[in-house]
């Protein structure tokens, strides 16, 4: 392998249609984000908001999945991550559709005059406690800078009446998040519990909330089969993105 190829592999993740560099981002490209970006409902979406975009992964995945006239706003508090997201977008097929904003979502959201029919976030979920290696990683992983109640309130202010707000969380935290959302007037419309294999309990949950009441569709996704290869359902969900599927 050439040195340049090795650096690319260390510093980012190559998908079928785009490359995500993440060496200057606290949170790297991982299965959680890939699941959320591939799973979120995009039918009839006209405008998308990505809260805490990090490397820009979710914004890029949603750009691939939606029509060319759908604008995407991606908001990131950390300046280094936002700059890398801007670079990833600039080198992607969709630089004209994705706008990265270096800002605090709590300051940015009240200034908006349009609403979004898809809001997506891979939010922090740890309560402040054990220190992280860097302040940037602590910001990305802990709810001190954006607690879940505030996130739900911001999404409620920015969403259209029939829009969806989608998140991925650890199973137990997702259950608490769901209860908090219901208490605030949200309706759970989609839920997918994610397990590593058939023998294990779910460890992640994908959730889609809406201001509008309606039937809730729930299912379960297993990432790997008994042979340790990706399952048919996981492959079907993500094969538009993974390079070797």
UniProtKB/Swiss-Prot annotation:
Pfam families: MTS. It is an enzyme of class 2 (transferase). GO terms for molecular function: nucleic acid binding; tRNA (adenine-N6)-methyltransferase activity. Its EC number is 2.1.1.223. GO terms for biological process: methylation; tRNA processing. This is tRNA1(Val) (adenine(37)-N6)-methyltransferase. It catalyses: adenosine(37) in tRNA1(Val) + S-adenosyl-L-methionine = N(6)-methyladenosine(37) in tRNA1(Val) + S-adenosyl-L-homocysteine + H(+). It is found in: Cytoplasm. Its main location: cytoplasm. InterPro entries: DNA_methylase_N6_adenine_CS (IPR002052), SAM-dependent_MTases_sf (IPR029063), Small_mtfrase_dom (IPR007848), tRNA_Adenine-N(6)_MTase (IPR050210), tRNA_adenine-N6_MeTrfase (IPR022882). The keyword rRNA processing does not apply. One of its GO terms (cellular component) is cytoplasm. Belongs to the methyltransferase superfamily. tRNA (adenine-N(6)-)-methyltransferase family. Keywords: Cytoplasm, Methyltransferase, S-adenosyl-L-methionine, Transferase, tRNA processing. The keyword Ribosomal protein does not apply.
